[in-house]
């Protein structure tokens, strides 16, 4: 195991935690957001009982909205791939929506590859700062917390898309089932989500340092696939992708995630001493993501298309 070239002292560790919002946030794993909304009049988000974690997710992405797209190379590449998979789908009548649209990466990738789309997807996201940077979100598009389910305008949807958003929800499996249930017969759900197996270097460092791992727990790929099938989806394409970045020390990794806004954690933040131990034990190994991509169709439409081949890579990840 190789140590980082420089370990911050206690004061620097405290300053770094404050930079990430240590009063509310921990140090967390990957997030991501994606996103002309055909439907414009969403209710304003004003639920005083909204879970605290949901609020921390919004705040993290809001603080980093200006730097998000410059850092989100993986999210851009996955968005392009998912858009390619949706390029030739026979879409039934009904609304389209991008769930967790953020700055609009996924919907823009879809429209670039399917410019004849009848209408652009509605942009749904909790973070107003990201929606303000989304060229597909109209001025009346209000934030929406996907933990509340989907707005009534999305009943009998023809296409629901989501990339790097489901993992931030309180119950990903239940929300996946809810999304599938809102499709029209023959409607499509296209999903990309980071899954368990990601960030193994972070987990290894936490074990070696005997500190809590504050990375976001990610859903199991098999559980998501099973939930989709139980919800009545016929899966046309299912693929588990692995992505990695060159080895970097722990501090650089956490700063990268901070620049994306992925700073919310379900765990209390590490204290400065714990942070120093974590960074000292961080292995010199690639940072790895495991991403599940699937496209499924709700039963009741025309016969499903043959299984789609893997699309060519788009912009580099």
Predicted regions and their residues:
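A short glycine-rich, Lys/Arg-flanked "PGG" loop and its adjoining helix->strand segment in the class I
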Residues: 173-188
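Conserved alpha-helix/loop element of class I SAM-dependent methyltransferases that forms part
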Residues: 73-93, 109
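Class I SAM-dependent methyltransferase SAM/SAH-binding core
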Residues: 96-150
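A short SAM/SAH-binding and catalytic strip from SAM-dependent methyltransferases
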Residues: 158-172
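Conserved Class I S-adenosyl-L-methionine
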Residues: 74, 103, 237-317
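A short acidic, Gly/Pro-enriched loop at the edge of an enzyme's catalytic core
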Residues: 150-160
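Conserved catalytic/acceptor-binding region of the Class I
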Residues: 186-248, 262-272
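N-terminal, positively charged/glycine-rich alpha-helical extensions of SAM-dependent methyltransferases
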Residues: 2-6, 13, 26-65
